[in-house]
């Protein structure tokens, strides 16, 4: 799949995960960006601590790479409790979930990533666990089967998803706290890049941090990945110090431009501009023109371009915006103006 090969893919790459854990902030005081989320969570956590209660169940949603897992771990650290981590696809049977729930200590956190991918049978078991701290388990099979209730300690479920709209209403309604993570501002990303450089022992100046941040598509995971690649460049082509000039040279070499676009982003936009006169163009024709699958365009390439105002989806098809023309140094056609 194209997403796995892109330097600017927001999804986690397996070999990155251990390093990412090392540079993640551990407490809210180290957590930069998402100001409203941070302020609200500070209040909710402090209130729960003062009452000696488990924090309400938390749903965190937003695009990949914005720190949902990081925030879940911070919540557990701030509450002074353990966290058990799993994901929706892993919980295939009700017994898988029951094994996790029955091993929780009071006020512990159970973090379920990709919670929108829970199977219906597992989700049914989760409802009474979230609402009443009870677990209904079927023992035996056939006519001899019977249900038993197990009492659970008060716990906090934190669910993370990139697709909040895919959650069922009964599940969504059981979360007392719902937080949406937004793309990060360049200033906040630059701070994150600087902190990561400190943790990794890198020499990085403020201008270098900003150069990396502005090409990171508003996503901390991408920013940290770009930092590691720029570090390689600085060590081999320079004295190891990362300045804005070194960062720009490295990222240009890696084909990540000053808007955070790679070859595929540019290919998509230029196809609309050059082959379809700026659009509108249907996604099937666009897929044929650039040699990609329709699903790749819709799920991988388009979201960031639309969010940043370079592309519009209309009932008649895709349109390149004036901002897209400006990015390529082209004149916007009159009908677009």
UniProtKB/Swiss-Prot annotation:
Signal peptide: none annotated. SUPFAM superfamilies: P-loop containing nucleoside triphosphate hydrolases, Winged helix' DNA-binding domain. DNA binds at residues 313, 318. Residues 185-255 are annotated as: Small ATPAse domain (RuvB-S). The keyword ATP-binding applies. One of its GO terms (molecular function) is ATP binding. Residues 4-184 are annotated as: Large ATPase domain (RuvB-L). GO terms for cellular component: cytoplasm; Holliday junction resolvase complex. Pfam families: AAA_lid_4, RuvB_C, RuvB_N. SMART domains: AAA. Has 3 domains, the large (RuvB-L) and small ATPase (RuvB-S) domains and the C-terminal head (RuvB-H) domain. The head domain binds DNA, while the ATPase domains jointly bind ATP, ADP or are empty depending on the state of the subunit in the translocation cycle. During a single DNA translocation step the structure of each domain remains the same, but their relative positions change. The RuvA-RuvB-RuvC complex processes Holliday junction (HJ) DNA during genetic recombination and DNA repair, while the RuvA-RuvB complex plays an important role in the rescue of blocked DNA replication forks via replication fork reversal (RFR). RuvA specifically binds to HJ cruciform DNA, conferring on it an open structure. The RuvB hexamer acts as an ATP-dependent pump, pulling dsDNA into and through the RuvAB complex. RuvB forms 2 homohexamers on either side of HJ DNA bound by 1 or 2 RuvA tetramers; 4 subunits per hexamer contact DNA at a time. This is Holliday junction branch migration complex subunit RuvB. It comes from Tolumonas auensis (strain DSM 9187 / NBRC 110442 / TA 4). The gene is ruvB.
């Amino acid at each position: 799949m194209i997403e796995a090969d892109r330097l600017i893919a927001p999804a986690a790459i397996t070999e990155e995960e251990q390093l990412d854990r090392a540079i993640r902030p551990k407490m809210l005081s180290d957590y930069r960006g998402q100001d409203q989320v941070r302020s609200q969570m500070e209040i909710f956590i402090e209130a729960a601590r003062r009452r000696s209660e488990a924090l309400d169940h938390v749903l965190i949603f937003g695009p990949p790479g914005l720190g949902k897992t990081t925030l879940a771990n911070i919540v557990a650290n701030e509450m002074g409790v353990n966290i058990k981590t799993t994901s929706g696809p892993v919980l295939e049977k009700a017994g898988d979930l029951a094994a996790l729930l029955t091993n929780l200590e009071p006020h512990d956190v159970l973090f379920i990533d990709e919670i929108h991918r829970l199977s219906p049978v597992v989700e049914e078991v989760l409802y009474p666990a979230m609402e009443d701290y009870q677990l209904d388990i079927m023992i035996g099979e056939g006519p001899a089967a019977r249900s038993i209730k197990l009492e659970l300690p008060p716990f906090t479920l934190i669910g993370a998803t990139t697709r909040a709209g895919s959650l069922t209403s009964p599940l969504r309604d059981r979360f007392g706290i719902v937080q949406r993570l937004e793309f990060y501002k360049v200033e906040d990303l630059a701070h994150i890049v600087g902190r990561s450089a400190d943790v990794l022992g890198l020499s990085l100046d403020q201008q270098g941090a900003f150069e990396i941040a502005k090409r990171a598509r508003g996503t901390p995971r991408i920013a940290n990945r770009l930092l590691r690649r720029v570090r390689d460049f600085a060590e081999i082509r320079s004295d190891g110090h990362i300045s804005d000039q070194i960062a720009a040279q490295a990222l240009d070499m890696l084909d990540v431009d000053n808007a955070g676009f790679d070859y595929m982003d540019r290919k998509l936009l230029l196809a609309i501009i050059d082959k379809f006169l700026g659009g509108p163009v249907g996604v099937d024709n666009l897929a044929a023109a650039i040699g990609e699958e329709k699903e790749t365009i819709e799920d991988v390439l388009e979201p960031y371009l639309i969010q940043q105002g370079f592309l519009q989806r209309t009932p008649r098809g895709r349109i390149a915006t004036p901002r897209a023309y400006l990015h390529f140094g082209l004149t916007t056609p009159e009908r677009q103006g």
